[in-house]
Design a protein with these regions (language model features):
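Low-complexity, acidic/polar, glycine-enriched regions of mature
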Residues: 23-211
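Generic alpha-helix initiation/capping and coil-helix boundary signal
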Residues: 3-4, 15, 56
Length: 211
């Protein structure tokens, strides 16, 4: 009994101090310059009164371009187990909620876009990309608002989609069953992708130029 109490108190203090350090994170603080990563952000209340941001991030992503004639689409995926929030208990809960045992990969497949749409996005610096997000064996139609910018010769795609756990039919993650932290039904999906890391893009550009 005393050992269980010590474990509980240790977890409480750990998450308490973690919450003090992770309040109100913006996307610029989540991703480092030059990273090729994805993340989620949600909000939780720690010990009933401390509001804190929770961020789970992965840089183990696969991004590739698929072409059909002059049209292209983009496929981005990552293993659920690669999401890291800095708290093992929370990450294990997320793995269970997202059914990682049976469907270990989350994948987004965009709709096909034309070359004119790509050029327009690069010129304007903003676009919306529609497609399907595959999570836990289910598919969800999504519309991602994105920004495109060039940094030191590298094009970067960033974006934030505001949604909720209930939109995906998911339970809310909780630390120690909600004793330590309760998560709100709020979810941000964050994108920070380097176009030079998108497989097949350079080959498609070279082929287009040669034609």
């Amino acid at each position: 009994m005393q050992q269980n109490l010590r474990i509980l108190l240790s977890a409480v203090f750990f998450v308490y101090f973690l919450g003090l350090k992770t309040q109100h994170l913006e996307a610029e603080e989540i991703f480092q310059k030059g990273e090729h990563c994805l993340a989620y952000k949600t909000e939780e209340t720690i010990l009933l009164f401390i509001d804190s941001d929770v961020v789970g991030k992965t840089c183990e992503i696969s991004a590739r371009l698929e072409s059909e004639g002059e049209n292209t689409r983009y496929v981005v995926s990552f293993p659920i187990r690669s999401l890291d929030s800095g708290v093992d208990m929370r990450d294990k809960d997320v793995i269970e909620i997202l059914s990682a045992e049976s469907d270990p990969i989350i994948r987004f497949v965009s709709d096909f876009v034309t070359g004119e749409q790509v050029v327009e996005a690069l010129v304007q610096g903003t676009t919306t990309l529609s497609g399907v997000l595959e999570v836990g064996g289910n598919s969800y139609k999504m519309l991602f608002p994105l920004k495109l910018s060039e940094h030191s010769g590298v094009w970067l795609v960033t974006g934030k989609l505001v949604t909720s756990f209930s939109d995906f039919g998911l339970e809310l993650p909780a630390v120690l069953g909600g004793v330590v932290a309760n998560t709100r039904d709020y979810l941000e999906l964050l994108v920070h992708i380097r176009l030079d890391r998108v497989h097949g893009l350079a080959e498609f550009q070279a082929e287009s130029i040669s034609q």
